[in-house]
Amino acid sequence: MTKQEKAENQEKPTEETVEETPKKETPFEPVMEADEVEETTEAQAPVEEADDKLAELQKKYDAMEDSFLRSQAEIKNIQMRNQKEQANLLKYDGQSLAKDVLPVLDNLERALAAEATDESLKKGVQMTYDHMKHALEDHGVKEIEAQGQAFDPTIHQAVQTVAVDGDQKADTVVQVFQKGYYLKDRVLRPAMVVVAQ
């Protein structure tokens, strides 16, 4: 080839096509130098310590909050129990006084049952009895109905048993020796009774 042919070849574009492969874009990864890596590790250490302390403090906080809530609930329960006990004390406040007065009421009943020659004396005893019974009823003391009722060991005290007679039913109160009384819903004194067997 002559020089002229070489020049022509250079000027003519060749028909060969070269396919270019597209380059993939890689994400930018900063290259850290050794000093920068050490600084990052040193900076992360206090952050990790702070995270650990925070987690520990959170656990302590949760435990204290739980303890606080339990204590509050216990205090509320104690207060409610206290109120209930006070209500019961007020409800049954006169129990010992009523127990002491019941024998006096029994004696007044016996005096009224006895034959009296002086009508004015009997009338005075009756008035005293009525007044005392009314005062006791005002404070929640009421008589236990026993005569003719089925025997109930929670409110009756059997002092004697007798054979069933005529139209009587077994386990029925046939006679009352001493009246029994309630104080509100509590048995103050059981009735002393005779029971048919």
UniProtKB/Swiss-Prot annotation:
One of its GO terms (biological process) is protein folding. InterPro entries: GrpE (IPR000740), GrpE_coiled_coil (IPR013805), GrpE_head (IPR009012). Coiled coil: none annotated. One of its GO terms (cellular component) is cytoplasm. Residues 1-27 have a biased composition (Basic and acidic residues). CDD domains: GrpE. Keywords: Chaperone, Cytoplasm, Stress response. Residues 32-41 have a biased composition (Acidic residues). Residues 1-50 are annotated as: Disordered. It is found in: Cytoplasm. Disulfide bonds: none annotated. GO terms for molecular function: adenyl-nucleotide exchange factor activity; protein homodimerization activity; protein-folding chaperone binding; unfolded protein binding. Participates actively in the response to hyperosmotic and heat shock by preventing the aggregation of stress-denatured proteins, in association with DnaK and GrpE. It is the nucleotide exchange factor for DnaK and may function as a thermosensor. Unfolded proteins bind initially to DnaJ; upon interaction with the DnaJ-bound protein, DnaK hydrolyzes its bound ATP, resulting in the formation of a stable complex. GrpE releases ADP from DnaK; ATP binding to DnaK triggers the release of the substrate protein, thus completing the reaction cycle. NCBIfam families: PRK14140.1, PRK14162.1. Homodimer. Belongs to the GrpE family. This is Protein GrpE. It comes from Latilactobacillus sakei. The lineage of its organism: Bacteria, Bacillati, Bacillota, Bacilli, Lactobacillales.
